[in-house]
Amino acid sequence: MIKNPKLLTKSFLRSFAILGGVGLVIHIAIYLTFPFYYIQLEGEKFNESARVFTEYLKTKTSDEIPSLLQSYSKSLTISAHLKRDIVDKRLPLVHDLDIKDGKLSNYIVMLDMSVSTADGKQVTVQFVHGVDVYKEAKNILLLYLPYTFLVTIAFSFVFSYFYTKRLLNPLFYISEVTSKMQDLDDNIRFDESRKDEVGEVGKQINGMYEHLLKVIHELESRNEQIVKLQNQKVSFVRGASHELKTPLASLRIILENMQHNIGDYKDHPKYIAKSINKIDQMSHLLEEVLESSKFQEWTECRETLTVKPVLVDILSRYQELAHSIGVTIENQLTDATRVVMSLRALDKVLTNLISNAIKYSDKNGRVIISEQDGYLSIKNTCAPLSDQELEHLFDIFYHSQIVTDKDESSGLGLYIVNNILESYQMDYSFLPYEHGMEFKISL
């Protein structure tokens, strides 16, 4: 998962430089300090060898010691001799050594050691290390350090490569996922099954991303509703203009004919009454237009309401109308029927539906309000509407044939009901049943 070679190369070189630098410093430190440690170690070995040999000489006679010292000096890099044999600080033995009192330089000199021989004599043996230990230590280092340094460099290279990949792969993974999140992909998420730090961070980012998507979807939904409302307003204004234009044109014709006393229009009282009726129709239409423009305000709040008390109040308003038509109203709702919407919106929906159910029921018909399987049901006995009428029934200012025959309704009622229910995202249907029509609203 290498998405950024430059970053990988840069991080690799940084890690390699650090490890290689540390390795170099360590090797330099070893080169500078090891000779002193080696001198100390050789000194301890030298002391131990001299002590052991001195103990061995105690078992020999004074005549045997010179030959033993000579053999000892030949087999080792240590010169051993009797101190009495030193003449002008030079020894005609195995080694010619320039010994400086009190200063060893590159040599290690053992102090005189007294030996009691087997024949009871007391002799002093002097041991001298005849090798440049400091130089020998450096030679040893120069023999091995180049190889160990190459091994260190190789290890640093391999370790830096795999360490950098292991370090950066989670970052590349985070970068890849967050880049897809920038495109608002609903299906992209961090793998929360990871047990490392990325898994923990991923859980937090997933939570934030899900909340962000939720907010964005809500905003998109609201924007769609706003666009829809704007389109509805345009259609509404056009429809309202058309609905007002027709009665105004009719009223103008009546008044002009009355002005010129043409035909029956000479009967002014009769046509003044008709003109007033036209004006009342336009006034009623304007009231409905103003009311329908407020449905957005009605749907801004939500509360849980019991439907029955609101319905009882509405039925009391239409009791006289129902009685005049001979329509029987059956309210089968209980106090358990509840809905989430504003009181004004609920009142407007039920008022329009109950009003239509009563107006367009058969003479001596029935209106039944009940709750069925989570739906509020309003049935009325009437002639079922055709499929063509049902298709356009919720369009603004639409008039079905039944409506036109019975009333001069504007057609705004069901349009308002449709908009309110859609604003609350409530499912609804208006379909024929065996005795008439049924309007159902999901609760």
From Swiss-Prot:
Q: Which InterPro entries match?
A: Bact_Sensor_His_Kinase, HAMP_dom, HATPase_C_sf, His_kinase_dom, HisK_dim/P_dom, HisK_dim/P_sf
Record GO terms (molecular function)? ATP binding; phosphorelay sensor kinase activity
Please list the residue ranges annotated as the Histidine kinase domain: 239-443
Where does the HAMP domain start and stop, copy by copy? 165-217
Null phenotype?
Expression of CbpA up-regulated at transcript and protein levels. However, another study shows that expression of CbpA is unaffected at protein level. Does not significantly alter nasopharyngeal colonization in mouse CD-1 strain intranasal infection model. However, significantly reduces numbers of bacteria found in the lung and blood at 96 h post-infection.
Catalytic activity entry: ATP + protein L-histidine = ADP + protein N-phospho-L-histidine
From the Swiss-Prot or TrEMBL record, state where the protein is found: Cell membrane
- Superkingdom field: Bacteria
Asked if the keyword Phosphoprotein belongs to this entry, the reply reads: yes
E.C. number, please? Answer: 2.7.13.3
Span-the-membrane segments of this chain are 16-36, 140-160
> Which Gene3D superfamilies did the record assign?
1.10.287.130, 6.10.340.10, Histidine kinase-like ATPase, C-terminal domain
- List modified residues, type Phosphohistidine: H242
Q: Which topology term describes how it sits in the membrane?
A: Multi-pass membrane protein
Keywords, sorted A to Z: ATP-binding, Cell membrane, Kinase, Membrane, Nucleotide-binding, Phosphoprotein, Transferase, Transmembrane, Transmembrane helix, Two-component regulatory system
Q: Which GO terms describe its cellular component?
A: plasma membrane
Tell me where it mainly resides. membrane
Q: Which SUPFAM superfamilies match?
A: ATPase domain of HSP90 chaperone/DNA topoisomerase II/histidine kinase (SSF55874), HAMP domain-like (SSF158472), Homodimeric domain of signal transducing histidine kinase (SSF47384)
A single Pfam family it belongs to is: HATPase_c
Q: What class of enzyme is it?
A: transferase
Function recorded in the entry: Member of the two-component regulatory system HK06/RR06 involved in regulation of target genes, including choline-binding protein CbpA. Has been shown in one study to not be required for regulation of expression of choline-binding protein CbpA.
Q: What else is on record for this protein?
A: Probably part of an rr06-hk06 operon.
This one is known as: Sensor histidine protein kinase HK06
The scientific name of the source species is Streptococcus pneumoniae serotype 2 (strain D39 / NCTC 7466)
